[in-house]
Amino acid sequence: MAPCIPKKYTAGQNPVTKFEGAFVVTKMDPPEGRCFLFHTVINVNHHRVKALEKSGKKPPKHFHPNQYEYFKVISGQLTVEINDVEHILTPEDGEVTLEPGPHHRLWGTPGQKNDKVVFLISASTNARSYQLDQAFFENWYGYQEDMMMRGTAPDLIQVCCMFEAGDSYLSPPWWVPFRHFFGYWLTVILGYYIGSLLGYQPFFPEWTTDWDAACDKMASSLLQKKFAIRELQDVVKKNFDANGDPLPAKKLL
């Protein structure tokens, strides 16, 4: 295990295409009282999505203790698992509100008639510096894409580091007592304390559109302020082409 090194530059891109076109996310202006709003398209029949479905892998189950999350399906079907029960959302459901606390995860419903599920996702604002917001999603999906394209498994410490910075916490299995307690402290200890000491950071200039705001967050943290290097985004951007792909390494003479 080692801290992440981003392989693609997507900061400032809108819309953002992930997983070879399986996901397309457009950042929109959020309404009052919400900290982000994403228009998301998932191609459930894309070969990357089908491969995940075949493997049985699903997004990590987690919970948010301080924010409401909102889902609104525009077309297709979206599966949202809440406290280990799967719910299939459709346009007829309107906007669905997930209160703080439940263990949950979501994915495009497999086997549906439509190739694509289109939905809006947003969350309430939060007085905390670290919260579920655009910076979290930009980095989380950037990291997932890197892992998928390289065919490697996610690093648990890196995942916890990013989730803790998004005020989100991994959910232990259903049979673990005091799931919120253990999930919270597992994420904090691995992601913040151990991760920060080992050089893991929650936000990266390659993926974060508002890098200054991310630096403000990290600068407010005793263990993560060392990562708040504001000029770093201009430096790393020179290593990528206009499409965000890495430039060929220069040969030494």
From Swiss-Prot:
Protein name (Swiss-Prot/TrEMBL): Oxidoreductase AOL_s00215g277
Subcellular locations according to the entry: Membrane
A GO term from the CC aspect: membrane
Pfam families hit by this protein: Cupin_2 (PF07883)
Enzyme Commission numbers on file: 1.-.-.-
Family classification: Belongs to the oxidoreductase OpS7 family.
Induction: Expression is down-regulated by the cluster-specific transcription factor AOL_s00215g275. Expression is also down-regulated by the HOG1-MAPK pathway downstream transcription factor MSN2.
UniProt note: phenotype after gene disruption: Abolishes the production of arthrobotrisins A to D. Shows significantly increased ammonia levels in fungal mycelia.
Gene Ontology molecular function: oxidoreductase activity
Entry annotated with the keyword Electron transport: no
Annotated GO biological process: terpenoid biosynthetic process
Function, in words: Oxidoreductase; part of the gene cluster that mediates the biosynthesis of sesquiterpenyl epoxy-cyclohexenoids (SECs) such as anthrobotrisins and arthrosporols, metabolites that possess a novel hybrid carbon skeleton consisting of a polyketide-derived epoxycyclohexenol combined with a terpenoid-derived monocyclic sesquiterpenol substructure (PKS-PTS hybrid). The SEC pathway plays an important role for fungal soil colonization via decreasing fungal nematode-capturing ability.
Species: Arthrobotrys oligospora (strain ATCC 24927 / CBS 115.81 / DSM 1491)
Keywords assigned by UniProt, alphabetized: Membrane, Oxidoreductase, Transmembrane, Transmembrane helix
Residue spans crossing the bilayer: 181-203
Pathway: Secondary metabolite biosynthesis; terpenoid biosynthesis
Recorded topology in the membrane: Single-pass membrane protein
Highest rank taxon of the organism: Eukaryota
Keyword Oxidoreductase: yes
Coiled-coil regions listed: none
SUPFAM superfamilies the record matches: RmlC-like cupins
